[in-house]
Design a protein with these regions (language model features):
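Solvent-exposed loop and capping/linker segments of extracellular ligand-binding repeat ectodomains
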Residues: 1-21
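Beta-sheet-dominated interaction scaffolds and their linkers
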Residues: 21-42
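Surface-exposed binding patches on compact interaction domains or structured appendages
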Residues: 22, 43-71
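Extracellular/luminal low-complexity segments enriched in Ser/Thr/Pro
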Residues: 69-85
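A short beta-strand micro-motif common to beta-rich folds, especially ectodomain repeats
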Residues: 82-94
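Propeptide-to-catalytic entry region of secreted or membrane-anchored zinc metalloproteases
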Residues: 108-232, 243-245
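Short pre-active-site segment immediately N-terminal to the catalytic Zn-binding motif
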Residues: 142-146, 256-281
Length: 339
């Protein structure tokens, strides 16, 4: 350090000190009233210790050496207590070097992971819809953003036929899923959210880890009172990522289960939030309809692109009873909707 401090050109820097590796990730941890545990990772190049922390959080490790996984637990907070915040300060032993994790707990009327019944079927046996949000941190949720967006999505779903007429046949649920961070990441940006939702391309959302994330979503949906593994194939899950980017997509499984990712697009209709809900959730996820377009000027039986469905995919979907809005015939009296 002394050599740098005395070297020509370096004396202009106000502070020159030895590099120390001490980083906590994430550097922010949030929660609502519920007692809950968050995972942290501390990177250090030497012995470290927790110098201070608010009394309402506990850590399973308060000292160590090198890289360490730490569990930080928020204590239960009484309803109506208001927000509380503080810092957990980590320090390298025998060195004046620190890093901090900001902790905040927000007051909210519902508990983390509490399942809410938005609507119960008053006719029939009840068809299950589960609307979930991803990328909503404790602050977003305490400000009402999650439930506002979920309720808007539900109304968009039932604002078009035939769902408008048959609304009384549906059970509708949501859950208070808190994400460590707010938003949705992409190819070059990782945002840690509850269900690992990320943007995978121009118009593609999904779980960062693929099938394991989808299984986690289905497991969460089964927390709803009338949803179980036995009827997941008859249940539609609608995921509302906390982003305004356009990128709706619906993942459908052979048995009938589906997860429709419907971001809050701010484009004009039909590419806005309402249109995405009606297309992905109502059209694909529930009705199992196929897209009535391709991405370029070509016939599907001669096209060899990888971006559009072709005859094989079409026939495969037809064999499952899907795509009743599509036909390969040019004869009007032979199409499924001919009357």
């Amino acid at each position: 350090v002394y050599l740098y401090q005395t070297a020509p050109g370096w004396s202009e820097f106000k502070r020159i000190s030895a590099y120390r590796n001490l980083v906590i990730r994430p550097s922010v941890a949030t929660a609502i009233n519920t007692s809950v545990t968050r995972d942290l990772v501390l990177n250090a190049d030497d012995k470290w210790v927790v110098e201070s922390a608010p009394e309402w959080v506990t850590l399973d490790k308060t000292s160590g050496t090198g890289k360490t996984e730490i569990k930080l637990t928020f204590s239960q907070m009484s309803a109506g207590a208001g927000m509380r915040e503080g810092e957990v300060v980590f320090k390298l032993v025998d060195k004046d070097y620190r890093t901090r994790c900001k902790v905040t707990q927000y007051d909210y009327e519902y508990a983390e992971d509490q399942i809410l019944t938005l609507q119960s079927a008053s006719k029939g046996d009840g068809v299950n819809l589960v609307f979930l949000g991803d990328g909503y941190n404790a602050k977003d949720i305490s400000e009402g953003k999650l439930l506002t967006n979920i309720n808007e999505a539900v109304e968009h779903f039932f604002n078009i036929e035939p769902y408008k007429t048959y609304r009384e046949y549906f059970n509708v649920y949501t859950g208070i899923a808190v994400s460590p961070e707010s938003g949705v990441g992409g190819v070059n940006t990782i945002i840690h959210n509850r269900f690992n939702t990320t943007s995978k391309g121009d118009v593609s959302l999904g779980g960062r880890n693929g099938e394991s994330d989808f299984n986690m979503i289905f497991e969460y949906a089964c927390k709803a009172p009338t949803v179980s593994n036995s009827n997941l194939d008859e249940t539609l899950v609608v995921m509302i990522p906390n982003t305004e980017d356009y990128g709706g997509i619906c993942y459908m499984w052979d048995g009938g289960a589906a997860i429709a990712y419907c971001p809050m697009s701010n484009y004009g209709y039909p590419m806005d939030f309402r249109g995405v809900i009606q297309h992905e959730a109502g059209g694909h996820g529930f009705a199992k309809l196929g897209d009535e377009y391709i991405y370029h000027n070509a016939f599907i039986d001669n096209c060899d692109c990888t971006c559009c469905g072709h005859v094989f995919e079409f026939n495969l979907a037809k064999a499952k009873g899907w795509y009743e809005n599509l036909s390969l015939t040019g004869k009007m009296n032979e199409v499924p909707w001919s009357h």
